[in-house]
């Protein structure tokens, strides 16, 4: 058997099946495309469903692939076992109605045993088959030549996911030798049992039946082959490593982690395994467009990163570091998966940002969790309240799984039902806070069955003659509506744009012979028609009437300027910040535009200026805006940007702005960028993890914004007594220097007053067991002033315990100080201040020599300060 690298095994598998007439299917993105049933691509066959279910006929019915995959159903086992992974590769060969069982078995055996390929010793291989699959048994025994004792019949060898294709499967096992198990009394020591000796290296699925709805099975007219070989497991056998983690797929990551840790892989293998596995998953997922967040696949990434940080702390890594491993992952995989190496700067930036965000709250959260665990143990409780677990999640970003792991290490459990209840209450609060759209509230009841078409003519026309086909008032269809009624209606054709793609709906009016109505909103009905919401302002309106429908042209003109500007902004963001930028949301109205986009880190003022300059340059170049209908495949091949998650038909509307921007879009646009006039960014901010927002105005809105800003600047100049607007910065700088000088003088005076007040406290010193004790209320503006007084008193007394308190509004501030000789006798400022503050309903802590705290009940201050003397007496 050859000792091969992981890259060689992967390529060898593909080359073998290419020789057998298979076409190579490229590895798909981990983020599923048009498959809402999957959170991640989780197997080699997951991306080939379109072929197996007949939606697409492949050019070649023989397919081979190496597919990156993610499974996260048992994250807690990763690191604790030899072969659990969240990210892994599946090698597979597939037949869509072409070859079947005999050929699949023959080629599998050839690849594994022929010295031209893997070259395993034949005597090391065993197989399992389904008890009723005589065909597979006979072929393995008679054609391949496997002895009967190495063909094991197992009831579980049947691939079935419910209704749909199914069939028996045959698994191939490699015997790693007696050093991995030789107990003749072990009931699991056989191929297919739970043991480390016989490892499954390949699964051949023979899809030959259809599982019918009534539970019966009927033969498929076209039989299929679906095989899967886990690369990590196969490589561990070839490289003869105890677990998958010692292979060349993981060891470079583990070695890079060892260089940062205070211990070694040999001494703490679980932590290193967790980190190595999780960084592979996160790096590839981010490279494929997923970003950490609080829901869906983003939550999975956040959970993995935070779990890795937790294990990193156990090996002495107490800072953001996972991002430093991204180049290592990229280097291992670059030959076949170049995307991590190509995007490593962006991936590292995303991971670092997420790590830093978690580290900001981690220590505080751990301290809270430690207190919760301590209290539970002190009261002999075995369960942590769900309310406490939710507080850790909601306030400190602790995923519930992470809390459960910490708690489990302490021999406790979490009330998961209580946690879930708190989560549901939060969701209900969020739902209640969201405003429901009244115009759509009756759609499902009234309009769900309406199939009458409504043709949109608003791309070409701003008004049209139409027929009112359906009228609704309240939740009922009506034949007539009168002045004052709020109604919803369909027209057989309409110039009103229905809100979609971020563009707001048109407003306007309809006029009939007997009345008129003002249209306030338009949305898409369940069956795709444009549903108008309006108020009858004159006379009456009836179903079947002819109506003149007119939009507010001035508003539409402003909307189209902002919409085309949004396309220019999208491309400019990619040009300046990088190709990773993708649209995450938008609003296009007549007053402004808002654009949300994926990007980690701040957008610098210089970058923002570049973006604005690029958009304006394209506006002033007077680029033509061309709109065409194309086939989806052609548009994408031409480089048209499609919105992630948006569903497109086979034909799409393509908006091209000169040679600069190309997007799929159903919205309304200018005919030439010169119509936009001027583009001005009004704000830029972060609105969530990895998502930022730009707001901007165009044309008249940009002029008005700049006029307002100029007016504000003129007003500031007058107040600052600056002769010219250009003098304002210099005048501000001069005033700031005067302010800094005054602050320094104020601080000096405050310090002198503090020292004087501290000196007066020497009269309140009490000697207890040779220790100078001062516990007093003083006048101090803040905690810093208190600390200064305590420092002054510590310098005046060799062996002292000091607690000073000050009222700040309705609250209390405490600072405690203990001199070194007093610390040597067992006094501790942090422990003392915690008890003092607790007596006023507060809390705090700190070092042995200096600590601070806050209190909530000023009425109990005297009682709290009196405790200081009791504390000193208890130790003296």
Curated annotation (Swiss-Prot):
GO terms of molecular function: alanine-tRNA ligase activity; aminoacyl-tRNA deacylase activity; ATP binding; catalytic activity, acting on a protein; transferase activity; tRNA binding; zinc ion binding
Reaction equations catalysed: tRNA(Ala) + L-alanine + ATP = L-alanyl-tRNA(Ala) + AMP + diphosphate
One protein family per Pfam: tRNA_SAD
Binding site for Zn(2+): 563, 567, 665, 669
Cellular compartments per GO CC: cytosol
The keyword Nucleotide-binding appears for this protein: yes
EC number: 6.1.1.7
Claim: rRNA-binding is one of the keywords in the record: no
Similarity section: Belongs to the class-II aminoacyl-tRNA synthetase family.
PANTHER family: ALANINE--TRNA LIGASE, CYTOPLASMIC, ALANYL-TRNA SYNTHETASE
Annotated function: Catalyzes the attachment of alanine to tRNA(Ala) in a two-step reaction: alanine is first activated by ATP to form Ala-AMP and then transferred to the acceptor end of tRNA(Ala). Also edits incorrectly charged Ser-tRNA(Ala) and Gly-tRNA(Ala) via its editing domain.
Protein name: Alanine--tRNA ligase
């Amino acid at each position: 058997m050859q000792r091969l690298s992981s890259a060689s095994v992967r390529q060898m598998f593909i080359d073998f099946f290419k020789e057998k007439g298979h076409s190579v299917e490229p590895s798909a993105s981990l983020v599923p495309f048009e498959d809402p049933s999957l959170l991640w691509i989780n197997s080699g066959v997951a991306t080939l469903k379109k072929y197996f279910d007949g939606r697409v006929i492949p050019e070649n019915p023989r397919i081979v692939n190496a597919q990156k995959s993610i499974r996260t159903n048992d994250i807690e086992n990763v690191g604790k076992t030899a072969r659990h992974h969240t990210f892994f590769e599946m090698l597979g060969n597939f037949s869509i109605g072409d070859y079947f069982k005999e050929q699949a078995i023959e080629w599998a055996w050839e690849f594994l045993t022929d010295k031209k390929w893997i070259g395993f010793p034949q005597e090391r291989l065993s197989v399992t088959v389904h008890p009723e699959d005589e065909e597979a048994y006979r072929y393995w025994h008679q054609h391949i030549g496997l002895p009967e004792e190495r063909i094991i019949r197992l009831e579980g060898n049947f691939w079935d996911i419910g209704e749909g294709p199914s069939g028996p499967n045959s698994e191939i096992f490699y015997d790693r030798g007696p050093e991995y198990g030789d107990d003749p009394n072990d009931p699991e020591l056989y191929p297919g049992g739970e043991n480390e000796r016989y490892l499954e290296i390949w699964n051949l699925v023979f899809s030959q039946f259809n599982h019918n709805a009534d539970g019966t099975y009927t033969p498929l007219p076209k039989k299929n082959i679906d095989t899967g070989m886990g690369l990590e497991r196969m490589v561990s056998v070839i490289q003869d490593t105890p677990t998958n983690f010692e292979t060349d797929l993981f060891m470079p990551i583990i070695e890079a982690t060892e260089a940062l840790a205070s211990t070694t892989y040999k001494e703490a293998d679980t932590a290193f395994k967790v980190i190595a596995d999780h960084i592979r998953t996160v790096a590839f997922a981010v490279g494929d467009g997923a970003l950490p967040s609080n829901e869906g696949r983003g939550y999975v990434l956040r959970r993995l990163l935070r779990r890795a940080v937790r294990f990193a702390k156990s090996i002495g890594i107490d800072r953001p570091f996972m991002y430093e491993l991204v180049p290592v992952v990229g280097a291992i995989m670059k030959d076949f998966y170049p995307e991590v190496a190509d995007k490593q700067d962006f991936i590292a930036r995303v991971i670092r940002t997420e790590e830093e965000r978690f580290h900001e709250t981690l220590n505080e959260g751990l301290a809270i969790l430690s207190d919760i665990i301590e209290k539970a143990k002190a009261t002999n409780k075995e369960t942590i309240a769900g309310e406490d677990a939710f507080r850790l999640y909601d306030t400190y970003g602790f995923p519930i799984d992470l809390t459960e792991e910490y708690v489990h290490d302490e021999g406790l459990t979490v009330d998961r039902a209580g946690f879930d209840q708190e989560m549901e209450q939060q969701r209900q609060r969020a739902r209640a806070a969201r405003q429901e759209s009244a115009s759509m509230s009756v759609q499902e009841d009234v309009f769900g069955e309406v199939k009458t078409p409504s043709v949109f003519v608003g791309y070409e026309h701003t008004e049209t003659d139409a027929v009112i086909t359906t009228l609704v008032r309240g939740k009922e269809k009506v034949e007539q509506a009168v002045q004052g009624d709020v109604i919803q209606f369909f027209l057989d054709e309409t110039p009103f744009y229905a809100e979609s793609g971020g563009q707001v709906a048109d407003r306007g009016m309809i006029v009939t012979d007997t009345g008129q109505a003002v249209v306030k909103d338009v949305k898409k009905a369940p069956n795709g028609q444009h549903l108008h919401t309006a108020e009858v302002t004159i006379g009456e309106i009836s179903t079947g009437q002819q109506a003149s429908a007119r939009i507010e042209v001035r508003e539409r003109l402003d909307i189209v300027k902002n919409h085309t500007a949004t396309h220019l902004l999208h491309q400019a963001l990619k040009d300046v910040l990088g190709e990773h930028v993708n649209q995450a949301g938008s609003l296009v109205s007549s007053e402004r535009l808002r654009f949300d986009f994926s990007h980690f880190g701040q957008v610098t003022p210089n970058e923002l200026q570049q973006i604005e300059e690029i958009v304006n340059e394209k506006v002033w170049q007077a680029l033509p805006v061309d709109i065409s209908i194309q086939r989806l495949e052609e548009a994408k091949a031409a480089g048209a940007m499609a919105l992630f998650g948006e569903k497109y038909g086979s034909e799409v509307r393509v908006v091209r702005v000169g040679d600069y921007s190309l997007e799929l879009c159903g919205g309304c646009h200018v005919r030439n960028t010169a119509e936009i006039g001027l583009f001005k960014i009004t704000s830029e901010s972060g609105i969530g993890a990895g998502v930022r927002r730009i707001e901007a105005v165009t044309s008249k809105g940009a002029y008005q914004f700049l006029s307002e800003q100029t007016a504000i600047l003129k007003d500031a100049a007058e107040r600052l007594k600056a002769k010219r607007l250009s003098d304002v910065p210099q005048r501000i700088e001069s005033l700031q220097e005067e302010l800094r000088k005054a602050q320094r003088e104020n601080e000096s005076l405050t310090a002198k007053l503090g020292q004087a007040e501290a000196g007066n406290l020497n009269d309140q010193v009490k000697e207890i067991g040779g220790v100078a004790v001062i516990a007093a209320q003083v006048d101090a503006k803040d905690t810093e002033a208190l600390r200064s007084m305590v420092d002054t008193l510590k310098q005046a007394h060799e062996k002292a315990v000091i607690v000073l308190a000050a009222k700040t509004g309705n609250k209390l501030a405490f600072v405690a100080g203990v001199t070194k000789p007093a610390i040597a006798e067992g006094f501790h400022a942090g422990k003392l201040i915690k008890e003092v503050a607790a007596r006023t309903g507060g809390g705090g802590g700190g070092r042995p020599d200096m600590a601070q705290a806050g209190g909530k009940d000023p009425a109990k201050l005297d009682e709290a300060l009196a405790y200081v003397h009791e504390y000193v007496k208890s130790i003296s």
